[in-house]
Amino acid sequence: MNPTLAVLGAGAKAVAVAAKASVLRDMGVDVPDVIAVERIGVGANWQASGGWTDGAHRLGTSPEKDVGFPYRSALVPRRNAELDERMTRYSWQSYLIATASFAEWIDRGRPAPTHRRWSQYLAWVADHIGLKVIHGEVERLAVTGDRWALCTHETTVQADALMITGPGQAEKSLLPGNPRVLSIAQFWDRAAGHDRINAERVAVIGGGETAASMLNELFRHRVSTITVISPQVTLFTRGEGFFENSLFSDPTDWAALTFDERRDALARTDRGVFSATVQEALLADDRIHHLRGRVAHAVGRQGQIRLTLSTNRGSENFETVHGFDLVIDGSGADPLWFTSLFSQHTLDLLELGLGGPLTADRLQEAIGYDLAVTDVTPKLFLPTLSGLTQGPGFPNLSCLGLLSDRVLGAGIFTPTKHNDTRRSGEHQSFR
């Protein structure tokens, strides 16, 4: 019986791993069965229904960084070129050709697709490879024996390994229930409506791409001033030259850097930075201002939301209070959002493997080459937390082909090797 890899979420990472597994299976290579457990649908976080976008905004990375990119597989000796060639059947270009839109895309200057179009591409790949999707919201993650159990309201999925993807839920809010404070999902729901947002003073919390896409949307609404609140001293622009981009698609030299050097690189290229496109729009709009600080407290008072900002200046901590008519919490997801799903026994297993209490820093530093938490059995793949140890491209869309290599090449999926005298057409294993 084949081992099973369960993926929490049916987004780009799930589709990329499933696509490569499908191609390897066609090549006669033993691979796990990939099952995605998803509450909405394939690529939902790129659609309005997922709560993270209205679907109309543009993808922040090149669509050619698709499910097989960078097409540099290293899984099957002497057959990796064949594997890469087969993976091109599920490339962005192949999708455009299949939907009779390749020439138009080229003629328009190869524009970044909308989030909705990107989700349609992911759904196209998932449909062609026959990705198995179990529809339901995972309410509990537990370890039973040597397997994972993903429990939804309707069913329980058993698997030999688990990969958790996605940013979690977009419904997080500073003041739940207060109409003057919008979560990410509430903002996009309002933005998608016919009525424009109408407010004098608006605050957007966050300095990353989630907040940036919200600012891009707010430009067309009736707001007098927009204040961006983030801990950084200013709003940094993401580096998008060759040297920055190569960090994402080729992590070969990443391990040679110290943790401090890696954190510095991530801060300059990935986390808490705006794209050059958004920065250009900010430059042209005099309604935009920036406040440095972290939100320590929020309260509704006299028709406003009062935010207490905490700012470190040298060795001293200062607090200031600011009033806004509308606050949008675009600070993004909690990196440990999924830990609330773990059973107590599972948390104990994780802390035993980590050698201490479960924290974001400790978990990130424990991600190994295969993008799984080291010293934890059964395997738990956490690609969204792998940037620090493995390279900045793995948590996002920048090297999905390398990601699938790392996951499918993990030791748990390597069956007993067959005799090297196997005939053509017999199954072979990795390496």
UniProtKB/Swiss-Prot annotation:
Pfam families: Lys_Orn_oxgnase (PF13434). Residues 1-21 form the signal peptide. GO terms for biological process: catechol-containing siderophore biosynthetic process. GO terms for molecular function: flavin adenine dinucleotide binding; L-lysine 6-monooxygenase (NADPH) activity; monooxygenase activity. The keyword Flavoprotein applies. Its cofactor is FAD. Induction: Induced by iron starvation conditions and during infection of human THP-1 macrophages. Transcriptionally repressed by ideR and iron. Pathway: Siderophore biosynthesis; mycobactin biosynthesis. Keywords: FAD, Flavoprotein, Monooxygenase, NADP, Oxidoreductase, Signal. It catalyses: L-lysine + NADPH + O2 = N(6)-hydroxy-L-lysine + NADP(+) + H2O. Coiled coil: none annotated. Its EC number is 1.14.13.59. It is an enzyme of class 1 (oxidoreductase). Belongs to the lysine N(6)-hydroxylase/L-ornithine N(5)-oxygenase family. Flavoprotein monooxygenase required for N-hydroxylation of the two acylated lysine residues during mycobactin assembly, thus producing the hydroxamate groups necessary for iron sequestration. Is also able, but less efficiently, to hydroxylate L-lysine (non acylated) in vitro. Shows 5-fold preference for using acetylated lysine over lysine. This is L-lysine N6-monooxygenase MbtG. The lineage of its organism: Bacteria, Bacillati, Actinomycetota, Actinomycetes, Mycobacteriales.
